[in-house]
C-alpha cells in the first residue's frame, strides 16, 4: 500500500479540504476478483485534471465527502474506499476520459440492485467538478452475482413451459395503447393469438385507468388466450402488466393472474423501481409465472453519450433483479440502437460468460456463474420486411414483437398475425437450409408471399417504410 493513499488513524486528524486524488487515485492498485469494477465516461469541468475527476467519482460514490472528517479515523478507510485505478483518454472526444473504479464488495448489500445503484450512481452524478458523467459498464463479480435469484425461470425453462423450440418467439403489442374497453382489448388479443402469434402484450402505460380497469382486462385477456389455445393447439400468453402504484397492489395483480392460470405477467422495471421488480421476480419464480420486462424511461437515462447510464448496465441490473424478457431495441426499427452495441448487451443478457470486447462496448469480462438468461425482445417500428434481418441479428433465443406491424394489416389483426408467422417460418426454414438472410432476405419474403395472400398484402403496405436516422449513441472510434 502506498503511504500516499493509505489512511491511518494514528497520524491524527487534520481538518480541512484536500484533493481527492491524494486518497482515491491509486494507479498501482491490483483489482481483486471480488471487486465490483466500473467504467465511467468522465467530462471534467475546465481546469479539473482527469486524475482528480476520476478520484472524485471514486470518493463520492463510496466513502468520501467534500472535507476531511474526524470519523475517518474510526474505520479502515483503505478497506472500504473506492479506488480510481486507471484513466484513459477517449480518442476523438475533447476532454472525455474513461475512469476505471474498483469498489470493495463489502460496500454493497447482498441481493440488492437498489443499494448497488444508490452508491455507484447516486449523488456523484450531480457533482459540480464534473461537466458530465456516464456509467458505461460494470463488472459484477461472481461472489456478488451469487447473492441474486435473477430471472424467475430463464430461457430454457420458458421454452419447456411453452413447448416451442428452434425459432424466435412472436409477439404483438395491442394498439391503440390507451382507450380500448376491456372487451375490445380482449378481442384484439384473441385475433392475434389465433392468427399464429405466441404472445400479445399490454403496452407499458396500460395499468388500471378509467377506460379499462386492470381486473376487467385480465379477465378478458385470459378468456382470449384460452380460446386461442384450444383453436390452435399451441400454448399462448399475454403479458398482463402488473405495474401499480404500490408494491402491494402490484403483487395483488400478479396473484390474480396466477389464479386465472395465465403463464406470464409484466412489469415496467425502471418506472416501477428495482425493489418492486425484485419482489415481483421472486413471486413469479415461487408461483410459476414468467415475467416480461418493459424498459420504459430507459432513454431518459441511457441515450446521451456523455451523461447517464448505458443500457448495457441497466440490462445487467435487470438480469440480477429478475426478468425473463426485456426490450432491447431492434437495430432496424424506429428506436435507437446501433448493431454492435445492441448485440453486445444482448449477449450479456443471454450468455453465461461474456469476454471483454471494446468493439461491442463491453469493458469487462462478465461471468454470470449460471444465473439464468433473459430473452431480448425486439420491438418498435418493425414489419414483415424486417423479419430476415431480425432473425439473423437476434437468432432463435429472442422475441420479435410487431405491434403496428400486426394490427396495421389492411385485412385485420388475425391476417396480420398470419403474415408475421409465415414470414418468420420462411426465414427460419431458409436459414436452416444455409441461405444468407442478410443477402437474400427480400427474395425469401417475396417467395413466401406467393403462397400467403396475408403476407403479400403486408408486403405491399410496408414496402417503402424505413427509419433512416443516425444513432445518437455510437461506439468510440
From Swiss-Prot:
Catalytic activities: 2 (2R)-3-phosphoglycerate + 2 H(+) = D-ribulose 1,5-bisphosphate + CO2 + H2O; D-ribulose 1,5-bisphosphate + O2 = 2-phosphoglycolate + (2R)-3-phosphoglycerate + 2 H(+)
GO MF terms held by the record: magnesium ion binding; monooxygenase activity; ribulose-bisphosphate carboxylase activity
Keyword check for Metal-binding: yes
Residue positions binding Mg(2+): 201, 203-204
Modification type N-acetylproline: residues: 3
Active site positions, chain numbering: 175, 294
Cofactor(s) recorded in Swiss-Prot or TrEMBL: Mg(2+)
Top-tier EC class: lyase
Entry EC no(s): 4.1.1.39
Residue numbers binding substrate: 123, 173, 177, 295, 327, 379
Listed PROSITE patterns: RUBISCO_LARGE
PTM (free text): The disulfide bond which can form in the large chain dimeric partners within the hexadecamer appears to be associated with oxidative stress and protein turnover.
Modified sites of kind N6,N6,N6-trimethyllysine: 14
Pro-peptide region(s): 1-2
Cell compartments where the protein resides: Plastid, Chloroplast
GO biological process terms on file: photorespiration; reductive pentose-phosphate cycle
Site entry: Transition state stabilizer: 334
Residues with N6-carboxylysine modification: 201
GO CC annotations on file: chloroplast
Protein name: Ribulose bisphosphate carboxylase large chain
Protein source organism: Nicotiana debneyi (Debney's tobacco)
Origin organism lineage: Eukaryota, Viridiplantae, Streptophyta, Embryophyta, Tracheophyta
Gene (name only): rbcL
